[in-house]
Curated annotation (Swiss-Prot):
Principal location listed in the UniProt entry: cytoplasm
Compartment list: Cytoplasm
Any one GO molecular-function label of the UniProt entry: ATP binding
Keyword Cytoplasm attributed: yes
Gene: groEL
UniProt name for this protein: Chaperonin GroEL
Organism superkingdom: Bacteria
PROSITE patterns for the chain: CHAPERONINS_CPN60
Family membership: Belongs to the chaperonin (HSP60) family.
Oligomer and partners: Forms a cylinder of 14 subunits composed of two heptameric rings stacked back-to-back. Interacts with the co-chaperonin GroES.
NCBIfam families (UniProt xref): GroEL, PRK00013.1, PRK12849.1, PRK12850.1, PRK12851.1
Stored Pfam families: Cpn60_TCP1 (PF00118)
Amino acid sequence: MAKEIKFSDSARNKLFNGVQQLFDAVKVTMGPRGRNVLIQKSYGAPVITKDGVSVAKEVDLTNPIENMGAQLVKDVASKTADEAGDGTTTATVLAYGVFKEGLRNVISGANPIEIKRGMDKTVNAIVNELNKSSKKIARKDEIIQVATISANSDKKIGELIANAMEKVGSDGVITVEEAKGINDELTVVEGMQFDRGYISPYFVTDTNKMIAKLENPYILITDKKVSSIKDILPILEEIMKTGRPLLIIADDVDGEALTTLVVNKMRGVFNVVAVKAPEFGDKRKQVLEDIAILTGGSFVTDDLGISFDKVTLQDLGQAESVVIDKDNSTIVKGKGLESQIKERISKIKTAIEMTDSDYDKDSLRNRLAKLNKGVAVIKVGAVSEVELKEKKDRVDDALSATKAAIEEGIVIGGGAALVHVSKRINVNTLNLIGDEKIGYQIVMSAIMSPISQIVSNAGFDKGVVINEILKATNPHLGFNAATGKYVDMFQTGIIDPVKVTRIALQNAVSVSSMLLTTEAVIYDVKDDKEDSVPAMPNMGMGGMM
């Protein structure tokens, strides 16, 4: 496919057109009085949403250069949501504001490289001021406020998230799933749960619920396969003397070993359940070590030189109870030493800090929660599939934003924090030279964009509102767009996570700087020649007999 190139202002103007179209689609969702956007889907009913992330994801323009501009900002906005859980619309609005003012100055002859340096210095100063004005949160009512705002003012979602965090802690694992009915639910799985069920249904102790429950069991933890009953017969005989049940967690239990265990279970000779070990490879070894530490047992593995014939009762884990169904096993109140469990938790926390992989971080956090307070599951219900998807997206965003608020603190919301910060930053203290000062002016103008959009969407005069906040002596004064009143934002619970505001600003300026310093755009050009098969000539009926 042929390529075409556009240069300098011609290229940047086209990129700006794309960014503007994305901005126009996303901006209407901003604030408590933001509007809905209707999105056509390739299949099924259209989706109605007020979620900026969902709107941005659907933007795909026909003009290739305009689409490049839109996609760059869209990617940065999505990255903001991934990192902070919220801020897609804020990042888009800020990026548009910076790019618009920056482009006007570059066209007028300003140096884009110096502008970029000035913008970077200004952003650093703003971030420092945001951190200074932030407030740490810990109380449940504060968590409800943050989660409610991030869920587009849905207080029920805010309360669900706060309740989940109360159960498992702010660093605990909270998952969001679709409920089977229309009601929202919160369930907490206490103890260590992993996604492996009983190997044979003959291990079931409750045929009505189809579960196997073991009270005060011993637990054999190994990454080996158990095929011969002779391998584990010595330890089985020791356990039988105690009269206590046994849970076997192994790579697999099959053949003669499985048959013998099932027969003895059915005859009432010995209460035992066998399950396959969770995960695979090195991750399996790590999880089995977690289970061993949680239950006070030893991990029976060739890597440590431990064979079945050397296993004693002291090598077996113990727990208050174990519940196993066809899909999951849950170990409740393992009897491991508290000091060893804390040491294991500390090592996992260190591993989380050391890794750059989001996948590995999630996996480690999951292990951490299972060793700590368990896993909370928020089940989201709705009347229709369309409503369910939109609601689930809001819960996911609110959950991430709430964790961000706990991590870095909060500032007053509604875009007012950036207005107050602007009063405390002086161009003369930033040591700017040349066109760097233009970069400062661009950013200082752009940070008024979020509050301007929120106020405009609510039908009020943005200029009047901004001037009132700039004149205010109360550093917490802002504008409640839902009621049209000036209020103390902290007292009324209108707050934003610092992390969301910070990352939205940093990402917006980063992508705008990149677009402003773009001097050429290379894009595909469709061939004018049609590749379709030519039409058959009109044969008529002549010559037919």
